[in-house]
Amino acid sequence: MAVNNSDYLNVIERKIIDELRIFFNTHHSSANNDVVKVYGQFPEPEELKFPSVVIEQVGSGFEQKMMGEKVTFGGTTYTGELYGVAFVINILIDKDTEYNIGTSPQGTTNAKYKQRRLLNWMMLNIANTITSIDWATAVSSVPAGLSYNPRYDASVEVVESHLRAWRDVGYLPAFQWYGATAEFSLIFKNYR
């Protein structure tokens, strides 16, 4: 836990982005190194690569304000409150993108998913990755080229988190893109 950490929101956002980058870039060994792009905001159109995951912070604020703002967590008294933050997670896949998932459920080795099948696979694995984030444990191995910063580990005490159902799942014919959107929110202890 980090007291007087005025950077909680950036720490949380970076941790989500890095955990997704680590998952997608290490899944099935080096076959997928740098295949899936994970962005912290929508990139400029000319910089957009596929497949991509775009994490957008859409809101934050006090979840529960304490009387007098003095709170006791674990026997120690601090100034603070419970604070919430919300993100929208977007998946974008163009019609030509493929991703090597390894061995498919049908037994195919080096199976390459694309279009709707890739979208379904990414929705499930993003959900699994995000809900499995251990906010208190440092990541032990990081692929080269990722921006992961171990100082972000163990600096946020998450009270609860919620990943809501994927929506707007489908195909956009004008761009020939597949996509889906989900909302993720979490509540953490904001010590000051």
Locate each region found by the language model.
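Short acidic low-complexity segments
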Residues: 37-49
